[in-house]
């Protein structure tokens, strides 16, 4: 990448307007980011977040509250027969838009941090069976898939 001419003197800075910095403020802890991952994987119930993330209930509670306050997640009431009403946690459209962010991080780190460049999971399009990945493209008609179109499998 290269800056356009007027930005090349390096006196200019994106500063507080940087969307990446704003996102990192929202995803400020490992637990918050893993809560997003688990939501993308379909986790919705508090106790399942605690178990799947592998951290304390207070840490998960703080993470879910932070995601809700930032507009990335909402609470949705549910009630099982004979039990008290409780809340599920679901990603908003803004939260679901983090799918390519998660996939880009996972894809890049699988390549460099995992033995043989392969992580424990692979992500495939349910319909075609093709692996799903993230690329930088200038094609406005490039194929896209949503989280609901992806099947997560163990890498073999």
What is each of the regions a protein language model found here?
Residues 5-8, 72-79, 97-104:
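Short, contiguous, well-ordered secondary-structure segments
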Residues 1-24, 70:
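N-terminal leader segment of winged-helix/HTH proteins
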Residues 1-3, 103, 107-156:
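C-terminal regulatory/oligomerization modules of transcriptional regulators
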Residues 28, 80-102:
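Basic, amphipathic "hinge/linker" alpha-helix immediately C-terminal to the N-terminal HTH DNA-binding motif
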Residues 70, 94, 127-128:
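Residue-level recognition of short loop/turn positions
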């Amino acid at each position: 990448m290269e800056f356009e001419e007027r930005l090349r003197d390096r006196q200019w800075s994106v500063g507080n307007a940087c969307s990446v910095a704003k996102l990192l403020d929202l995803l400020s802890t490992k637990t918050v980011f893993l809560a997003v991952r688990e939501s993308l994987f379909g986790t919705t119930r508090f106790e399942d977040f605690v178990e799947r993330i592998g951290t304390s209930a207070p840490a998960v509670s703080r993470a879910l509250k932070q995601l809700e306050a930032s507009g990335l997640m909402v609470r949705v009431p549910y009630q099982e027969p004979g039990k008290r009403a409780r809340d599920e946690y679901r990603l908003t459209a803004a939260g679901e838009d983090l799918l390519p962010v998660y996939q880009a991080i996972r894809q890049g780190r699988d390549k460099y941090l995992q033995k043989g460049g392969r992580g424990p999971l692979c992500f495939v399009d349910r319909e075609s069976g093709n692996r799903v990945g993230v690329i930088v493209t200038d094609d406005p008609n490039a194929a896209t898939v949503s989280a609901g179109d992806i099947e997560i499998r163990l890498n073999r």
